[in-house]
């Protein structure tokens, strides 16, 4: 009886603290996050179809948000008449956005980005703005033009956070590699300067079957090739993709936000935002993870929760993501379409949740 009572009070304490025990399981047995670090969802802050010239009339998703010179910039994938391109919206308060249209164009026929030039991640080195974006020569048929494998990392640069962006076809950061853990996808991610080198937390996946994870790439020159880790940073069975990092100075802890791919009735889809935490940028324990946002605490998207991007604003951490108010989930590839962009918040400082023994 004492054990039951003490366990009950531990559970109540976790709920009050923003943590909770999670019991959801997946039909194929893929790992789950056993605890929660619940963000407070604000709802949709950017609707697809708001961009000029139909640039996002079929969807707005895969966001990358950053601050520069007192303004906020949001790169997002706009699903337009000819395919998906990285588009720009700007804001002063993270809640009201002005859509400005595409910032990249399709490459010429035969180029690695001839079918899509999307998901534009950025890094400012103090002089130049560097963009690492996702390119692919393959998509599904019209009208959706959903990017298909291989997912490649490509390079552009600019003199300001709003561009214009000049593609650097002469620079090949890295590519997919046959018979490796990144045979299908080696797409861009968050960059951290660590001592005399840069670390990129890139998205990696096999092509068949598709196993997804985050891994490390290293370089000392942003305009040179990167060296990819021989082994993934986290197990591919985690089924995660995309990265956005935040460093909590109060406890010297790194928090890596990512989206998880779940499965229901045989359909894989992005079902949650997870966060991992570590004191070491190069070592991450798959046990140290929690659910941040899913259908349980999202106000409007009851199934799909995709690709996080985090940015600090005062004493809160803003978490951008994409979702869909469709219910049930659209069948097949249609689950990728008609996304909108939402915003959720976590209070700072962040504290790593504590796993309670069963």
Predicted segment positions?
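Positively charged n-region of N-terminal signal peptides that target proteins for export
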Residues: 1-4
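Bacterial N-terminal signal peptides
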Residues: 8-18
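Carbohydrate-active catalytic/glycan-binding domains of CAZyme proteins
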Residues: 21-358
């Amino acid at each position: 009886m004492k054990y039951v009572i003490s366990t009950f009070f531990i559970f109540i304490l976790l709920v009050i603290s923003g943590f909770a025990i999670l019991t959801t399981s997946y039909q194929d047995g893929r790992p789950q996050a056993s605890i929660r670090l619940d963000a407070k969802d604000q709802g949709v802050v950017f609707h697809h179809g708001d961009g000029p010239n139909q640039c996002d009339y079929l969807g707005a998703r895969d966001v990358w948000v950053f601050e520069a010179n007192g303004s906020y910039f949001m790169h997002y994938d706009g699903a337009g008449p000819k395919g998906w391109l990285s588009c720009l919206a700007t804001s002063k308060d993270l809640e009201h956005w002005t859509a400005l249209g595409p910032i990249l164009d399709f490459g010429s026929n035969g180029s690695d980005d001839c079918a899509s030039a999307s998901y534009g991640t950025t890094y400012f080195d103090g002089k130049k703005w560097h963009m690492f974006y996702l390119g692919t020569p393959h998509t599904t048929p019209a009208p959706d033009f959903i990017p298909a494998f291989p997912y490649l990392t490509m390079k552009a640069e600019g003199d300001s956070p709003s561009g214009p962006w000049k593609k650097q076809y002469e620079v090949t950061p890295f590519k997919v590699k046959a018979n490796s853990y990144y045979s299908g996808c080696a797409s861009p991610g968050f960059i951290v300067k660590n001592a005399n080198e840069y670390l990129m937390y890139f998205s990696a996946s096999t092509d068949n079957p598709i196993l997804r994870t985050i891994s490390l790439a290293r370089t000392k020159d942003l305009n040179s090739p990167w060296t990819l880790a021989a082994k993934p940073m986290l197990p591919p069975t985690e089924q995660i993709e995309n990265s956005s990092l935040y460093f909590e100075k109060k406890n010297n802890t790194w928090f890596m936000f990512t989206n998880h791919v779940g499965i229901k009735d045989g359909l894989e889809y992005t079902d949650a935002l997870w966060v991992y935490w570590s004191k070491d940028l190069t070592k991450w324990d798959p046990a140290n993870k929690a659910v941040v946002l899913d259908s349980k605490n999202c106000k409007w998207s009851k199934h799909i929760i995709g690709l996080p991007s985090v940015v600090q604003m005062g004493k809160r951490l803003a978490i951008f993501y994409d979702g869909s108010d469709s219910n049930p989930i659209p069948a097949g590839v249609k689950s990728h379409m008609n996304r909108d962009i939402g915003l959720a918040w976590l209070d700072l400082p962040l504290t790593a949740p504590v796993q309670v023994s069963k």
